[in-house]
Amino acid sequence: AAHRRRPRVRNRDRGAGLNTAGFVSGYRGSPLGGLDRELWRASKVLDQAGVRFQAGLNEELAATSIWGTQQANLFPGVQVDGVFSLWYGKGPGVDRSGDAFKHGNAAGTSLHGGVLVAAGDDHTCKSSTLPHQSEYSFIDAMMPVLNPSNVRELIELGLRGFALSRYSGCW
């Protein structure tokens, strides 16, 4: 479902007369271990939709890359109106990326960009060394939290989340 959201954002942007691109980066690991595999599998669809997937060397570098996408319009020669971006990772990655989240969120998003952050929490510590509930880390970084409860809401809140990110400037 996550890889289907990117083309929908770009299609909505095109309908509004915008030429945007997408960027996805994060770090593999359970409970999101299959997301990057699905993104690689959908690479042709994503490429055709103007969405680049770049797996991160680690969570923090992935978050820093996301931050950079929101600065694209600060440089001459940019070919898009904005870049909408998705970071993904699990609880320890959220912890590791705190500085990039705080500074990226404080810097804001580009007018036609936007950032969503997807955290795969392991509340029962089934596949992680420590249990996680990332909402508190996001609150600490002053990042709004959306909590979809099913796939339909994941897609709908993803679309609305990018619109909210653009409007508010928040990640």
Language-model segments: residues:
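Thiamine diphosphate
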Residues: 1-158
